[in-house]
Curated annotation (Swiss-Prot):
Pathway named in the protein's UniProt entry: Porphyrin-containing compound metabolism; protoporphyrin-IX biosynthesis; 5-aminolevulinate from L-glutamyl-tRNA(Glu): step 2/2
UniProt record similarity statement: Belongs to the class-III pyridoxal-phosphate-dependent aminotransferase family. HemL subfamily.
Gene behind the chain: hemL
Record-listed N6-(pyridoxal phosphate)lysine modification sites: K263
InterPro entries: 4pyrrol_synth_GluAld_NH2Trfase, Aminotrans_3, Aminotrans_3_PPA_site, PyrdxlP-dep_Trfase, PyrdxlP-dep_Trfase_major, PyrdxlP-dep_Trfase_small
SUPFAM superfamilies given in the database record: PLP-dependent transferases
Record's protein name: Glutamate-1-semialdehyde 2,1-aminomutase
C-alpha cells in the first residue's frame, strides 16, 4: 500500500498538533494513516487505500459510515435550523424519553458532551448524594481522562497514573481487581462507611474485553446495598451495543443506581449522559445542589443523531444483524487460533471482539466457549482467559501493536491501535467483510 499522503499529512500535523494527533490512541506506529472518508463498513485513507473498519470511531458508529436516510435527514434538518440555542429543545426530551423507556434502571437523565464528562459528573453526583468521598474502581479500568480514576496501585495504596494529577486525588480512590469478589469484600470491610460508589464497566471494554465471572456484579450490587454506597455502571462503550436497547445491565440483569452513557447514544456526534433513579439524578442543579452545567450539553444535532440512530436500530433488527456477524467472526477466529496459535484467546460479546495474545492455554480445547471467552467454568480455557486488566497486560502486547496491527493494516483491515481497546461490528458490515477479515487474520497470525 502507498501511504505518501498520510506521511505528508502526519509531518504537517506534527508541527501544529501535540504528537500529531488529537487522541493518543490514534498515534499508531510508525505513523497513522489519515482518513479521507467513510463508506458503509469501510474507510478510505488519503492515499485511496480501502480498509474494513472495525474501529468504528472507537465505538460510536453502530450503523457505520453511510447513515440511513432518516438519520441523515434529522441531522441536516437540525443543523439547518441553527447550530445551537442556549435553550432547551424538544429533541433532547425525546431522546431522554427513549432511553428511559428502554433501560430499566434509568428514570431520569442529564446529557453532557463526552463519556469523560459523564463519568466526572457521575462521581461528583455520587459523592454529593452520599456525603462520602471514596470511590472504588477496577484496576486497569478506564473511565475517561479524569483525575479521580486515573490512578494505579492496589487497594488504598494508589497513586496518580499521569503527571499533573495531585497525589491527594488518589487518596480517595480505591482499586480492586475486576472479577475478584474477595478483594471487593475486603475493601468494603475496611472502608465501607466512607465509600460513595463503586464505578465499573459491566465488561472491561478498554482493557481487552474482560467478561465478568458469574455472580460478580451481583456481589458488587449487594455490597453497595449493604453499605449504603451507589453502584455506577460505566456503559459508555457497552451502552446500546451489548444487550441491545436494554444495554449490558439488561443482559446481566443488574440495576445500577447510576449509569453513564456515551458513544452510540449520540449517533456519532460528541455526547455523554448520566442516568439513574430520579431521586439521585435530581440532585444535579438546578433541582439539587450538585453542580453540573455545560454550554453544548443536549446539543440539538447530537440529540437528533442519537434519537434517530436508536429508533432505526429498534425498527430494523440492527442488533440481530451485528450480533450474528460478531458471533460468526469470533467463531471463525477461534478456528484459526486452534490451528495456528492455541494459546491466544478470542474475547467479546454481541458486536464486540478482540484477539488477546495470551501466553498459555489448555492442552485440549475441546468444549471451549463457541464464540469467545464467556468466563464459563466448564470451558477448558477458563483458567487461562483474562479475568483482570493485569491478565491482559501479561499478554504479548508489544507484539500485537508492533507486528500484528501493521500486518492487518497492510491487508486492508483497520483495527484499534493496541491490544486493550475493543473492536466493533456495525450494521453496514456484511458477511463478505467477515470472510475477508478472517482471511486477513489467518495470514497475519
Amino acid at each position: 500500500m502507498n501511504h505518501e499522503q498520510s506521511r505528508a499529512l502526519y509531518d504537517r500535523a506534527l508541527s501544529v498538533l501535540s504528537g500529531g494527533v488529537n487522541s493518543s490512541v490514534r498515534a499508531t506506529r510508525p505513523y497513522p494513516f489519515f482518513v479521507e472518508k467513510g463508506d458503509g463498513g469501510h474507510v478510505i485513507d488519503a492515499d485511496g487505500n480501502r480498509y474494513i473498519d472495525f474501529v468504528m470511531g472507537y465505538g460510536p458508529l453502530l450503523l457505520g459510515h453511510s447513515l440511513p436516510e432518516q438519520v441523515q435527514s434529522a441531522i441536516q434538518q437540525h443543523a439547518a435550523e441553527g447550530p445551537m440555542y442556549g435553550a432547551p429543545t424538544e429533541v433532547e426530551v425525546e431522546l431522554a424519553e427513549f432511553v428511559t423507556r428502554h433501560v430499566p434502571s434509568v428514570e431520569m437523565l442529564r446529557f453532557v458532551n463526552s463519556g469523560t464528562e459523564a463519568t466526572v459528573s457521575a462521581v461528583r453526583l455520587a459523592r454529593g448524594y452520599t456525603g462520602r468521598d471514596k470511590i472504588v474502581v477496577m484496576q486497569s479500568g478506564y473511565h475517561g481522562a479524569q483525575e479521580s480514576t486515573l490512578v494505579e496501585g492496589e487497594g488504598d495504596h494508589t497513586a496518580p497514573s499521569s503527571p499533573g494529577i495531585p497525589e491527594s486525588f488518589a487518596e480517595h480512590t480505591l482499586t480492586v481487581p475486576f472479577n475478584d469478589e474477595e478483594a471487593a469484600h475486603e475493601v468494603f470491610e475496611e472502608h465501607g462507611d466512607d465509600i460513595a460508589a463503586v464505578l465499573t464497566e459491566p465488561i472491561l471494554g478498554n482493557y481487552g474485553i474482560v467478561h465478568p465471572v458469574e455472580g460478580y456484579h451481583d456481589t458488587l450490587r449487594q455490597l453497595c446495598d449493604d453499605h449504603g454506597s451507589l453502584l455506577i455502571f460505566d456503559e459508555v462503550i457497552t451502552g446500546f451495543r451489548v444487550g441491545g436497547l436494554q444495554c449490558a445491565q439488561g443482559a446481566f440483569d443488574i440495576d445500577p443506581d447510576i449509569t453513564t452513557f456515551g458513544k452510540i447514544v449520540g449517533g456519532g456526534f460528541p455526547v455523554g449522559a448520566i442516568g439513574g433513579k430520579s431521586e439521585i439524578i435530581e440532585q444535579f442543579t438546578p433541582a439539587g445542589d450538585v453542580f453540573q452545567s455545560g454550554t453544548f450539553s443536549g446539543h440539538p444535532v447530537t440529540m437528533a443523531a442519537g434519537l434517530e440512530t436508536l429508533r432505526y436500530a429498534a425498527e430494523h433488527d440492527v442488533y440481530g444483524h451485528v450480533n450474528d456477524l460478531g458471533e460468526r467472526l469470533r467463531a471463525g477466529l477461534q478456528d484459526i487460533l486452534e490451528d495456528q496459535a492455541p494459546e491466544y484467546t478470542v474475547v467479546g460479546r454481541d458486536s464486540m471482539f478482540k484477539v488477546i495474545f495470551t501466553r498459555d492455554g489448555p492442552d485440549s480445547l475441546e468444549g471451549q466457549c463457541e464464540a469467545g471467552c464467556q468466563q464459563q467454568e466448564s470451558c477448558p480455557r477458563f483458567e487461562y482467559c483474562p479475568k483482570t486488566g493485569h491478565d491482559v497486560t501479561q499478554a504479548e502486547t508489544e507484539r500485537w501493536e508492533r507486528l500484528f496491527w501493521p500486518a492487518m493494516k497492510d491487508q486492508g483491515v483497520f483495527l484499534t491501535a493496541n491490544q486493550f481497546e475493543s473492536q466493533f461490528i456495525c450494521d453496514a458490515h456484511t458477511g463478505e467483510d467477515i470472510e475477508n477479515a478472517l482471511e486477513a487474520y489467518k495470514e497475519a497470525i
